Amino acid sequence: MFELPKLDYSNSALSPIMSEQTLDLHHGKHHQTYITNLNNFIKGSDYEKLSLEDIIKKSSNEKKAGIFNNASQHWNHNLFWKCMKPNGGGNVPTKLENKIKEDFGGFEKFREEFINAGVTQFGSGWCWLSLKEDKLVVTKSPNAENPIIHNMKPILGCDVWEHSYYLDYRNKRPAYLENFFDKLINWEYVDSLL
């Protein structure tokens, strides 16, 4: 059965970019609910023996919305928490920086594209930096959808569901995304996934 991962930082460590109250609710309540629901859905089924990624792929193909949504949200959040750190942002490791320049034509162009993907995601969803074959691509996805089901490898994800930012930013999703990008991203972790 799946369990809520322990964060690599305290619930107050990302403040004021992401408040302790937001992190308490987002990690301790929302993420925990996805895990509880997933465990209830798969208990006693063939899914119980599968890895999280295999559950996502199989349930997506079999149109098992309850299983897929909760499994995918669990995976998405696991990546999201790892992609942040206190005093994040800043310098990007050379390997990742060179790959970004190669695939996007420059870091600022990538930043703009990533933030724009999150801003323009209608309703709830995610924006992603993923490897598609050997190329980095920015995508967005609705609700719980994950690039894994499109044969991509996500290496950076930002949650743009309202529960991620509404307590701190109200309806200012662009400000949330800019702060996430400039002040929270753990570039060393993202680089390690290349």
Regions found by a protein language model. Give the residues of each.
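Feature for soluble, non-membrane regions of globular proteins
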Residues: M1-L194
